[in-house]
Amino acid sequence: MILLIIEVREVSREEKLRTIISTIDNSEYSNNKDNNIQHNCKMKTFKDPQETWLSSTFSKMKYADYKPFQFVDGEGVRCSIYLSGCLFACKECFNESIQNFNAGSPYTMELEDKIIEDLGNSYVQGLTLLGGEPFLNTQVAIQLVERVRKEFGDKKDIWVYSGYTYEQLLKSSEDKKKLLSLCDVLVDGPFMIFLK
């Protein structure tokens, strides 16, 4: 008789994502010149996040939607803004229609004033930035978040949903680092339907 002992341990979300991300075939975005090979990867990746995907290059300073008084984009009642444009192109993305940087409407001071007014309600816990990719729209995101901090200090929390990982953002451009430093919660990493 053989006794098999299996150690069971909890795996953190970060460990799961690292394992999953390391098994994704990203070769179609590498220097592979063989176009006859079929690839399953739908997520675009990059070698140097600081020098390739810059907000100043891609952002059109547009937003796709603003939804006040939401319950699904973080804890408590939230005001959520969906910024236009994303280069990750995650497979089965919920917001595929706003991956285009030209989607939606120009961000205006009138919209910003409305967001600040809505956040002023005592029952609203905070602001959520989604997309698209907020870190590819830092001109808009930083302006809005700095205004929220000026008006409310730390009384309203700020959440950001991003296809970037925390580690990538730490090595990224200065504008991305600044936005990261202004936020309270980062929900990071590419969207993967099987983790839902």
Describe each region flagged by the PLM.
Residues 72, 167, 195:
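Flexible, glycine-rich phosphate/dinucleotide-binding loops
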Residues 183-196:
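Classical nucleotidyltransferase
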Residues 7-15, 25-28, 34:
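Acidic, Ala/Val/Gly-enriched low-complexity intrinsically disordered segments
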Residues 29, 38-39:
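Low-complexity, intrinsically disordered or signal/transmembrane-proximal segments
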Residues 2-8, 17-22, 41-82, 95-101:
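N-terminal [4Fe-4S]-dependent radical SAM core
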Residues 53-64, 77, 95-160, 164-176:
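Conserved Radical SAM active-site core
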Residues 78-93, 133:
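Cysteine-centered iron-sulfur cluster-binding motifs in ferredoxin-type domains/subunits
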